[in-house]
Regions:
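Active-site glycine-rich loops that stabilize anionic/oxyanionic intermediates
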Residues: 13-16, 82, 202-203
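Conserved alpha/beta-hydrolase
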Residues: 29-49
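Gly/Ala-rich beta-loop-alpha elbow adjacent to hydrolase catalytic centers
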Residues: 79-84, 88
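Flexible "cap/lid" loop of the alpha/beta hydrolase fold
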Residues: 96-133, 170-178
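Helix-rich cap/lid subdomain of alpha/beta-hydrolase
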Residues: 117-162
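Short beta-strand/loop motif that positions the catalytic acidic residue
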Residues: 192, 198-200, 204
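Conserved alpha/beta-hydrolase "acid-adjacent" motif
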Residues: 205-211
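Catalytic active-site module of serine/aspartate enzymes centered on a nucleophile-bearing elbow/loop
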Residues: 222-265
Length: 265
């Protein structure tokens, strides 16, 4: 049971809050894990974020999360969804992490999109003007058609009702990394030394299976890639999410058991 006591920190994606992992947290808690799902800076529900959100960088989010992990004082397991998956990679390159579970992760600097749709999405946002300097309010019909397309109508609306504005700068750094002179999301894959599970939804258009596969391939033998048939982007809450969480738990059990065996040999 000692291995199971590692804290699990779940990092949400764009336009969300820690609430997005409520189901996962309950399931992991039932298996003996201590879990946390902090809100990123200015992502609290029912509070209009300050204008500063628009200029909040992925580096700011990463620094905040580093401070959170410092307070925990233990080597964590990180689970990240979408943009949160990119933040999890950034953290694992900076500090010791026991394991990473990346759910439909956004790709770091240098990883090209795998599909025309991903290119078109980035181009459409770029044509909207200087979005990188301002807050981005969620566009519900876009989210419904893409990120939440596999969620039943009644459940989809309840998720959309909880969406919050996002940082234009962080979105720019994630979707338009080739134009980011600061290379905010650049990661040397050699700095990420923990085991990694990368999971893609076979129907995901936001972060396509090809893109997620490219993320996994950066980490060579340390990463396992899984593509889940019938699933889209909202792997943390669309119907059948429980089997994805169960897959993650089983993988973690194997990783921690192997770690314990190696330590005892």
């Amino acid at each position: 049971m000692a291995a199971l006591r590692s804290p699990v920190v779940m990092i949400h994606g764009a336009f969300c809050g820690g609430w997005a992992f409520d189901g996962w947290r309950a399931l992991f808690k039932s298996k003996g894990y201590e879990t946390y799902a902090p809100d990123l800076r200015h992502h609290a529900e029912d509070v209009e974020p300050p204008s500063e959100l628009g200029q909040t960088s992925m580096l700011d989010f990463a620094r905040d999360l580093e401070a959170f992990l410092d307070e925990l004082g233990e080597e964590p397991i990180l689970i990240g969804h979408s943009m949160g998956g990119l933040l999890a990679q950034m953290l694992a390159a900076r500090r010791p992490v026991r394991a990473l579970v990346l759910l439909a992760p956004s790709a770091p600097w240098g990883v090209l999109p795998a599909t025309p749709f991903e290119y078109a999405s980035a181009q459409a946002l770029y044509l909207a003007g200087d979005f990188w300097n301002r807050r981005l309010w969620p566009t519900h019909w876009i989210a419904a058609a893409n990120a939440l397309d596999n969620v039943p109508d009644d459940e989809r609306q309840s998720v959309l009702d909880r969406f919050v504005p996002e940082s234009g700068l962080a979105t720019f750094e994630t979707m338009h990394w080739a134009l980011d002179l600061k290379r905010a999301t650049q990661i040397d894959p050699r700095d990420v030394v923990c085991p990694i599970l990368c999971i893609a939804g076979a129907r995901d258009r936001v972060n396509s299976p090809g893109t997620v596969r490219s993320v996994a391939s950066r980490y060579r033998g340390r990463a396992r890639y899984e593509e889940i048939a019938g699933h889209s982007h909202w792997l943390i809450g669309e119907p059948g999410w429980e089997k994805i969480a169960a897959l993650s738990l089983a993988w973690l059990d194997d990783v921690l058991a192997n770690e314990s065996a190696a330590a005892g040999s």
